[in-house]
Amino acid sequence: MQLEHLPVGELAAGQPLTIPVYRFKGTSDAAPSVYIQANVHGAEVQGNAVILQLLQYFKAHPPLGDITLVPLANPLGINQKSGEFTLGRFDPITGINWNRAYLDQAVHLDDWYLLHGELPEQVLFDAFRRLLIANCEQALANPWGVTTGQRLALNLQKLAHGADIVLDLHTGPKSCKHLYCPEYELSAAGYFHIPYTLVMPKGFGGAMDEAAFNPWWQLSDYANSRGRELKVAVSAFTLELGSQERIDLADASRDAEGILSYLSYREVIAQSIQPEVMSRFACMLKDYRKFHAPMAGMVEYLAEPGVPLAAGAPLVNMLRLDRVDAGTEVTRLSLNEDVIPVLHFASASVHQGTELYKVMTNYFTLSG
């Protein structure tokens, strides 16, 4: 195991901001390489506990493929505190979500494929990977500079582009475990110990998983349109590991085992680790809906994340103590279709328009 401290910024008083990068050299050149990061959002700490479990596993069981692990991936966000709460979801300078600052790799495939399209598959993949990394380096070297969030994101993205498998470990506010999975990799969702999957289309919205898989998906589609069948060479997922501001080592062990189950399936490790048998459900990303508060007030969250909710069943109670005289101090809200609540807002005090819940609609069974 090798440990490097990678500079990703500086504070106003001159102190450097660095992230720890743990590397394990694989024993087989044929095995896929893996990049795993955690804690890009300051309050989403459980992924660090999962990486600790993986570190201990790889020390005892040398992997076949190269492994790069980056816990504590956002030192500025992690240290962005207000009283007892960690903020750290948005760059405090620009207000942009830390997980929306990655580079959109807008490769001009007409020109690039004309020069590289006849290369052997692995040679072509290597050339494309070098291009993606070079684009990140070019963006970092912009003579006009980059924002704090972009500097962090580009350094993380460079690391991710070096791998065949990219896992970004997050949590929700108050949340059940769920997985963001690209549509072309849906069969892999059954290996993680996660019951709910959001199926992602091709496209880029600024997040790490999209930054990792979207260029390769575009390359595959372009090659196929030119009569050459190319697989999507990179697999990328976002794992949402429950709720923020929470460390649970026993739960981290279960999540690490789910990751190892997937890595076993991909032959990154020599050990055979079977996925947990569970009911799994999915919906398309377009059917993952947000419910916004139609009124302000104090909220009693009634629907438990991860428990199916029938149409018309109580979702929340809204308390308005300014309406006691009118007898309308409690308003019960529900939805008009069957859903699976996935997460809800962390605070019980909300403005009108606050995102109260995210729910799966039009969901379907993946496996039993």
PLM regions and their residue ranges:
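Structured catalytic-domain cores with a bias toward divalent-metal coordination
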Residues: 1-368
